[in-house]
């Protein structure tokens, strides 16, 4: 709908002389706005053969973590996990620099025709953030309408935002060098003013992950777990959550015909159970096929929004083309997936917590049941590894340790998330499992068929009745038999012709875990957890 010019007062944010406010536009209006004649550059959307619109985000095909800042003031000084306290993206900004950036964005938005989209972040009424997005660009309004929870007309009647996001993608900061910033682009947060500013980057994910970072600030301080995970629920109301970094299988494994999807990326866990932060999904589309991922493929239709996908003049899509980026994406409202929890994306307490890792070293077992102490250790470690090509063409593993499986989005110290998750799991009697979707001694990746059989065994409880053995160095308890899984792969040592090769690799990986975890040993709790990790 188009709001009367004065019905939403944007001057309270420093935006003046607004030409017109297009308030909470319908999908029909957004479609016509983002594809209308006369649009140029990154404003322009292209209609594809599947009915979804495709947009180009320019050189910004992913987040810009080096351009992320939080104003250091009385609110944040003693709570935020600052980049000078540990390796993270929470760089401090002065209030003076903030004022300058805010002036740039409000000047850019003043005098323009603007889209204002009011949303909820969080499916729990008591703790959700009411987030208002202000942008010049129709498809950016479309993106947040897809990704956040869409309020009803009744909920909009007395809507007062808790947080405001001003997207000034068309402005840059020429004074960045003298201000000691990383570049002319910026993604900045002020927790006193409760505003996020975006400048220079057109990437839609900055709005999504920006609010995730804010939920990661507010919820743990209230004793609520804030998690980078997918979640689903079975017919008996048994909730499962899947932690994992990009490429480990979060979205694929939580999309299960036997279970209803709660959400695919961001969740909270409070006194009532697990709830989604979002109203949509943001899926990778590189090499997407209808055969391999039918749910995601079928979600790409009218109202979905593709980003940086190769589309020809006739609207034909080439999902295999990575010439623009590997990080091609689609956002769509969650109701584009059939098998979802309705009407609200929430369910009861989790009974099964799964940590997904893709171990390219070929060391970790396909599955291990974790003790409470191991759960905290592996959660804080947040390990995965990728195979990266070297100059000589040899592929060698590159380890990634990302605390809580989402260090890029943590606003507080990682131990705060670990403590809250530990309490939630303890109260619910939940059990944790480490599931490796990576490689073993055969040089091949563990098949998705085997991994799905493992997930089934975790969810139906049969894994808990299996006879087990212990993998050395890591002291992980692994089952000897799981239905549907070749028995010899469950102990990774069996996948090597020469078990001493596994030993050497295991020692190497164990050392990497130990070295990474050293940063947590500055507290008594961290020191106590060392015994739960690999022992050399």
Curated annotation (Swiss-Prot):
One of its GO terms (molecular function) is metal ion binding. One of its GO terms (cellular component) is cytosol. Its EC number is 4.1.1.49. Substrate binds at residues 63, 203, 209, 329. ATP binds at residues 209, 228, 244-252, 293, 329, 445-446, 451. It is an enzyme of class 4 (lyase). SUPFAM superfamilies: PEP carboxykinase N-terminal domain (SSF68923), PEP carboxykinase-like (SSF53795). CDD domains: PEPCK_ATP (cd00484). Pathway: Carbohydrate biosynthesis; gluconeogenesis. Gene3D superfamilies: 3.90.228.20, Phosphoenolpyruvate Carboxykinase, domain 1, Phosphoenolpyruvate Carboxykinase, domain 2. Mn(2+) binds at residues 209, 228, 265. It comes from the Bacteria. Keywords: ATP-binding, Cytoplasm, Decarboxylase, Gluconeogenesis, Lyase, Manganese, Metal-binding, Nucleotide-binding. Its cofactor is Mn(2+). It catalyses: oxaloacetate + ATP = phosphoenolpyruvate + ADP + CO2. Binds 1 Mn(2+) ion per subunit. It is found in: Cytoplasm. HAMAP family: PEPCK_ATP (MF_00453). Monomer. This is Phosphoenolpyruvate carboxykinase (ATP). The gene is pckA.
């Amino acid at each position: 709908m188009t709001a009367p010019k004065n019905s939403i007062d944007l001057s309270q944010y420093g935006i003046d002389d607004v030409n017109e406010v297009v308030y909470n536009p319908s999908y029909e209006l957004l479609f016509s706005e983002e594809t209308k004649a006369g649009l140029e550059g990154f404003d322009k959307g292209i209609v594809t053969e599947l009915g979804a619109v495709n947009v180009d985000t320019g050189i910004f095909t992913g987040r810009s973590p080096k351009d992320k800042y939080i104003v250091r003031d009385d609110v944040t000084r003693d709570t935020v996990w600052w980049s000078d306290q540990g390796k993270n993206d929470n760089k401090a900004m002065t209030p003076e620099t903030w004022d300058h950036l805010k002036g740039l964005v409000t000047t850019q938005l003043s005098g323009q025709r603007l889209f204002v989209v009011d949303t909820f972040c969080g499916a729990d009424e008591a703790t959700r953030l009411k987030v208002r997005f202000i942008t010049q660009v129709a498809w950016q309004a479309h993106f947040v309408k897809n990704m956040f929870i869409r309020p009803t007309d009744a909920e909009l009647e007395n809507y007062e935002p808790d947080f405001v996001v001003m997207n000034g993608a068309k402005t840059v900061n020429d004074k960045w060098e003298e201000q000691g910033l990383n570049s002319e682009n910026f993604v900045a947060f002020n927790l006193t003013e409760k505003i996020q500013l975006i400048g220079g980057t057109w990437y839609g994910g900055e709005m999504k992950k920006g609010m995730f970072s804010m939920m990661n600030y507010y919820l743990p301080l209230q004793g609520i777990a804030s998690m980078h995970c997918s979640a689903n629920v079975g017919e008996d109301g048994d909730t499962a959550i899947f932690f994992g970094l990009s490429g480990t299988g979060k979205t694929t494994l939580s999309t299960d015909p036997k279970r209803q999807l709660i959400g695919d990326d961001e969740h909270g866990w409070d006194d009532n159970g697990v709830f989604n932060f979002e109203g949509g999904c943001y899926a990778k589309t590189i090499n997407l096929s209808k055969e391999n991922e039918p749910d995601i493929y079928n979600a790409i239709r009218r109202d979905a929004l593709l980003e940086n996908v190769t589309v020809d003049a006739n609207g034909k899509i080439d999902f295999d083309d990575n010439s623009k980026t590997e990080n091609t994406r689609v956002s769509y409202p969650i109701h584009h997936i059939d098998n979802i929890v309705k009407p609200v994306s929430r369910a009861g307490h989790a009974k099964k917590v799964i940590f997904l890792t893709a171990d390219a070293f070929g060391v970790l077992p396909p599955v291990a049941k974790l003790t409470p102490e191991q759960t905290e250790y592996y959660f804080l470690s947040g390990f995965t590894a990728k195979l990266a090509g070297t100059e000589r063409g040899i592929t060698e593993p590159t380890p990634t340790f990302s605390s809580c499986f989402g260090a890029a989005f943590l606003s507080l110290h990682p131990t705060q998330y670990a403590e809250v998750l530990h309490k939630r799991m303890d109260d619910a009697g939940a059990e944790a499992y480490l599931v490796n979707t990576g490689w073993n001694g055969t040089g091949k990746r563990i098949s998705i068929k085997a991994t799905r059989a493992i997930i089934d065994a975790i969810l139906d409880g049969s894994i808990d009745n299996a006879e087990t053995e212990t993998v050395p160095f890591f002291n992980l308890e692994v089952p000897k038999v799981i239905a549907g899984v070749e028995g010899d792969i469950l102990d990774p040592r069996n996948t090597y012709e020469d078990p001493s090769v596994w030993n050497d690799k295991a020692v190497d990986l164990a050392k990497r875990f130990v070295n990474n975890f050293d940063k947590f040993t500055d507290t008594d709790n961290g020191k106590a957890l060392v015994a739960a990790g690999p022992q050399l």
